[in-house]
Amino acid sequence: MDERLLSGESAYEDADLEYSLRPQTLRQYIGQDKAKHNLEVFIEAAKMREETLDHVLLYGPPGLGKTTLANIIANEMGVNVRTTSGPAIERPGDLAAVLTSLQPGDVLFIDEIHRLHRSIEEVLYPAMEDFCLDIVIGKGPSARSVRLDLPPFTLVGATTRAGALSAPLRDRFGVLSRLEYYTVDQLSAIVERTGEVFEVEINSLAALEIARRARGTPRIANRLLRRVRDFAQVRGNGTVTMEITQMALELLQVDKLGLDHIDHKLLLGIIEKFRGGPVGLETVSATIGEESHTIEDVYEPYLLQIGFLQRTPRGRIVTPLAYEHFGMEMPKV
């Protein structure tokens, strides 16, 4: 898969930046109003009852703030957060080590929770439901099961693929929140806030232009701002202006709707080789040289969101909106 400026997935260089930009409270958090308002109520109710917050599942496309919300939940509850991920928990013993290290009320954040192995999920069920851990000591006929009590804790799971979670695991979450793509105005506010942290002057029109091309995703907006800032420092006087922004994004091959060369390759591949579709996913995969799950999970969601692509029982179809974007006429049936 090509390295991608417009990927919502976290890159190595994003880690320190995201930590420094991360809001600490729900009041500071921009966007996701529905999820935020619900969490405010659930957190306040748990604090009034002096209980731990119910387990929370955050799901939606990458880069929308799931990790940030997990940290905010811990801050609002006044507890510590322990962070891990589905791929990092390889054996039941790994999960047991994490669970037994928790303090009362702590938040355990598991990113990519859909990638937990089923055997590990089974260890998690009694931990989530009864705050206890069943472990097997010994082997063979002499093996015996021992139950350990755990302190009450809140599990916050994050996933880009809620449908990949097993039903028993999903049903054990008391709070399910879907994170939606951000509006241009929300992203513009995020870009301006990031500019303040960077101590870089940014024109409000430039912030709006970056927001329009950020695919509804804060992580992408901040990444684009970093690259535009580089152009402003080298090709300008350090101020992020509209002129600098448009020049930088054109050179970075990010068009006015936030589509890049990979989006163009996918859409034009279907248009030019299959008359716009319908065409099967595996055929698209072979045509553009990308794995089918990458196309489905990484490239297609935004194209579906903006109405440039349709998934049908017969395959993928490029819509009239996409033809219009490329200045092309749809083939006559």
From Swiss-Prot:
Biological process annotations from GO: DNA recombination; DNA repair
One family name in Pfam for this protein: RuvB_N
Region annotated Small ATPAse domain (RuvB-S), chain positions: 183-253
Binding site for DNA: R311, R316
Gene Ontology annotations for the cellular component aspect, listed alphabetically: cytoplasm; Holliday junction resolvase complex
EC top class named in words: hydrolase
Span list, region Head domain (RuvB-H): 256-333
Gene3D superfamilies listed in its UniProt record: 1.10.8.60, P-loop containing nucleotide triphosphate hydrolases, Winged helix-like DNA-binding domain superfamily/Winged helix DNA-binding domain
Reactions this protein catalyses: ATP + H2O = ADP + phosphate + H(+)
Entry EC no(s): 3.6.4.-
Gene Ontology MF term list: ATP binding; ATP hydrolysis activity; four-way junction DNA binding; four-way junction helicase activity
Region (Large ATPase domain (RuvB-L)): 1-182
Keywords: ATP-binding, Cytoplasm, DNA damage, DNA recombination, DNA repair, DNA-binding, Hydrolase, Nucleotide-binding
Localization in the cell: Cytoplasm
Function summary: The RuvA-RuvB-RuvC complex processes Holliday junction (HJ) DNA during genetic recombination and DNA repair, while the RuvA-RuvB complex plays an important role in the rescue of blocked DNA replication forks via replication fork reversal (RFR). RuvA specifically binds to HJ cruciform DNA, conferring on it an open structure. The RuvB hexamer acts as an ATP-dependent pump, pulling dsDNA into and through the RuvAB complex. RuvB forms 2 homohexamers on either side of HJ DNA bound by 1 or 2 RuvA tetramers; 4 subunits per hexamer contact DNA at a time.
Family designation: Belongs to the RuvB family.
Comment field on protein domains: Has 3 domains, the large (RuvB-L) and small ATPase (RuvB-S) domains and the C-terminal head (RuvB-H) domain. The head domain binds DNA, while the ATPase domains jointly bind ATP, ADP or are empty depending on the state of the subunit in the translocation cycle. During a single DNA translocation step the structure of each domain remains the same, but their relative positions change.
Subunit structure: Homohexamer. Forms an RuvA(8)-RuvB(12)-Holliday junction (HJ) complex. HJ DNA is sandwiched between 2 RuvA tetramers; dsDNA enters through RuvA and exits via RuvB. An RuvB hexamer assembles on each DNA strand where it exits the tetramer. Each RuvB hexamer is contacted by two RuvA subunits (via domain III) on 2 adjacent RuvB subunits; this complex drives branch migration. In the full resolvosome a probable DNA-RuvA(4)-RuvB(12)-RuvC(2) complex forms which resolves the HJ.
PANTHER family, A to Z: HOLLIDAY JUNCTION BRANCH MIGRATION COMPLEX SUBUNIT RUVB, PTHR42848
Cited HAMAP family: DNA_HJ_migration_RuvB (MF_00016)
UniProt protein name: Holliday junction branch migration complex subunit RuvB
Source species of the chain: Bacillus cereus (strain 03BB102)
